[in-house]
Amino acid sequence: MSATIGPARNRVDGRLKVTGAAKYSVEFEVPECAHGWTVESNIAKGRITAIDTKAAQGVPGVLAVLTHLNTPKFQAAPKKEERGGGGGIRNEERFPLNDDEVHYAGQYVALVVAKTIEQARQAGSLVRVSYAPEEPLLTMEAAEHKAQKPKTNHDEHVQIKKGDVEAALKDASLVKIEQTYITPTETHNPIEMSGTIAVWAGDKNLTLYDATQFVKGVQNIVAHAFGLELENVRIICPFVGGAFGCKGAVWMHVLLAAMGAKLAGVPVKVHVTRRNMFVGAGHRTPTRQTLSLAATRDGKLQAIQHLSETLTSTVGQFTESCGARSTGLMYESPAIRVEETVYPVNVSTPTFMRAPGECPGTYALECALDELSIALKMDPVALRLANHADNHPTKNVPFSAKHLKEAYQLGAEKFGWAKRNPEPRSMRDGDVLLGWGMATATYPAHKMSAAAKVQLRANNTATVQCATHDLGTGAYTAFTQISSEQIGLPFENITFELGKSDFPFGPVAGGSNSTGTVGTAIHAAAGLLHKALAELAVKDSKSPLYNLKTDDITMVAPGRIGLKTDSAKSDAYADILKRAGKESIEVQSEQKPPEENKKQAFQSWGAHFCEVKIDPLLPRVQVTRVVSVMNCGRVVSAKTARSQIMGGVVMGIGMALTEETSYDPGTGLPVTRNLADYHVPTNADVPEIEVAFVGEPDFAFNPIGARGMGEIGITGIAAAIANAVYHATGKRVRDLPITPDKLI
C-alpha cells in the first residue's frame, strides 16, 4: 500500500459533484414540499403596529402566513449549552416572529408558505406591514455612547497589555508611524445560498435538510427551540457549496422553515435568495484600526499599539478580534497594547467570515509594518526577520514547529524578491507600473471535541463515520486519507461518511479545526480497533498472537497487527475476523476538549509575495503574480491543501480590490444586494498563484501532525496587495477596497 497521507489524490466526491449527483440541502426531493417566502422589514428600528395578510392569504396555493401575531413562542437553550463548541450558536438572541420589535432593516417580519415558490413570492409581496419607526444607530459615530470593550471573545482575551507602550511612543529617539486602516462590510456570497427543508413526522420528530457547517449545533438549537428530545431531531447535510463561516451558526430562516412546516402541516423549503444573503446570512463587520509602531533605527520594534473598532448588532454580540488575533502574537516587542471596541448598531448580526479577526487584523498590521520599513529605509522582509518571535510575545511560551523564517526565504527565492528596487514607481513593464509587496500570514491551530466510529469488515473494507462536514474543502478526501493510514487499509477500501447528526459528534467546520480535530478522533478510533482485533487474536489458538499481551500488539503493516518488538509475528485483520466468525467489528472513540497546553503555543504561519501592474492612465490594479509559502504542519492532502491556500488568496484579492457592501444611510438597507453590484473576483482577476509548504509535522499539536489550512491563505494577502500598490504608485491607500478612484 502506497503512502496515503500527503500525496495528491483526486477528490473522492469529485465525480458526484461534476455529474450533478451530489445532493445539496435544498435539492433533496421531499413529497408535497411547500415553499416559504420571507417578508422583510423596510425600517431599521421601531415597532410593527399592524400587519394586513388578507390579500396574501387569498392567493391560490397559500397554506399559511406566519407573523408575530400567530407564531408560537420558541424556547431558548440554556446559555451554557448554546454558546460554545458543542451546543451551536444562534446568530440572534431574539427569536423570529416572537414580538413586534424591529432591530434592523431586512429583519424577517413574516413568512408565507405556499404550494409553489411563485405563489409564495406573490403572496409575500401582498403582505402589508405598518410601523412606528424610531431613529436607528447605523455608524460608529452614531453609536459612540453605546461603545463596549469586551474582555473576552469565545474565552479568548481581547484586551491585551504588555510593557509600557506610552513611554515607547513618546521616545524621541525611536522611529514611529501611526496610521488608521479601514475595511468595509464584506458579505458572504458562497455559490450555494443558505437554505433549509423541514419535515415533521408527527409532533415530536423533525428532520432538517440544512446547509450548515455544524449539524450537531443545529440539532441542539432546534431541539431546544421546539422542546424536542435531541435524538428526535435529525439534521442532514452531506454536501455544502461553500460556507466560509456564514453557515456556522443557526440563522432565522432555519427556525422559520421548521415553524412554517409545523403550522402548515406539510414539509417546507426556505431557500435564502441571493438578495437576502445580504441581510440574513451574515457579513464581516467593517473595521477601523489604528496602528502605532515604534522601532529603533536598526528595526527592532519597541512598541506595537493596535486599537480596533468594529460594529455588532443590537440582537447578537459578535466581536471581530482584529488586534488580539494578529498583533498580540506576531512580532517580538517589549511593549504591546491591543484594544477592541465594539459598537452595537441597527444592522443584521455580523458573523464568522474566513479568518475572523486575523484577516482584517493582518491587513492593518502588515500595512503598518510596510510603512515602518519605508520610514527606516529597510527591506520589508528584513524588518520582519529582525522582529521574528520564537516565543509567543504575550504568553512567553515557545511556538511549536514554527518555520516562518524558512517561509520568508523560500517565498523570496521563488518570487525573485532580491531583484526588487525599493523606490516607489521605479519598476515598469513597458508603460505599465509594476509593484512588488509582501506580508506575513498567520492563523491559530484549533482543537475541539470529536468522536469517530469505525466498522471494519472481513473483506478488508471499512466505513468511518463522524458528524463533521465537507464545505467544498476536500474533507471527504482528507479524512479518507487519514483513515487509510491510521486503520491500515488501502485508500480505496475506506468509505468516510459525514454530514448527519446521527453520526458520532463532530465539531463545527470552522476555525480550521476539522483536520486536526477529526483526524485525532480517527487516530483514537483506529487504536481502539487494533486493540479490539488484538483481543480477538490473543484468545485464538490458531493466531500467531495467541496468549500474548494486547498492550504489546500494534498495527505493524497494512491490514496486519503484530508484536511491537517483532513485526514478523503478526496476523491479518481479515483472518482474525473470519476465525472469530465475525463479518465485522465496530468501535467508537470519544475525544473531549483538550486541556490548554501552557508550555507551547500552536500557530500556523506563512508569507505572501505579490506583484501588481497598474496602467497610470487608467489606474485599475491587476494582480499578476502571487507566491504563497505556508507552514501548517503535516500536509495531509497535497492537492486540496494547495487549493485551500489558492482559495484564500483569491478571496483576499476580492477583499483588497473589489468587495464592499454599502448601506443606505436613510433606511439602513444594503444598497449592494446582488453579484452585479457586489464584485467578487472572476477568472480574469486571478493570476498565477504558486503555493509551497515548509516545516515538519506538528506532533506536539496532535497525533496526525497537521494544522488547519482553510483560513490562513486569506490572512496577509490584502496587505501584500496594498503594499505592492504603494510600491507601484507611491500612493498609500488605507481604506479597502483599492478602487481606481482612490489612485487618481
Residue ranges and their predicted role:
Residues 36, 206-210, 461-466, 623-625:
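Short, aliphatic-rich beta-strand segments
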Residues 7, 13-19, 80, 86-88, ...:
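Glycine-rich loop/linker segments at domain edges
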Residues 230, 239, 243-265, 269-271, ...:
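Thiamine diphosphate
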Residues 59, 69, 227-232, 262-270, ...:
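C-terminal catalytic domains of large/alpha subunits in multi-subunit enzymes
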Residues 75-80, 123-126, 210-211, 219-221, ...:
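Short acidic, glycine/serine/threonine-rich loops at helix termini
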Residues 1-156, 179, 253:
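Flexible, low-hydrophobicity surface segments
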Residues 12-16, 125-138, 213, 220, ...:
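Extended active-site and interfacial segments that coordinate phosphate-rich ligands
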Residues 145-226, 388-461, 671-682, 687-693:
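Helix-loop-helix junctions that connect adjacent transmembrane helices in secondary transporters/permeases
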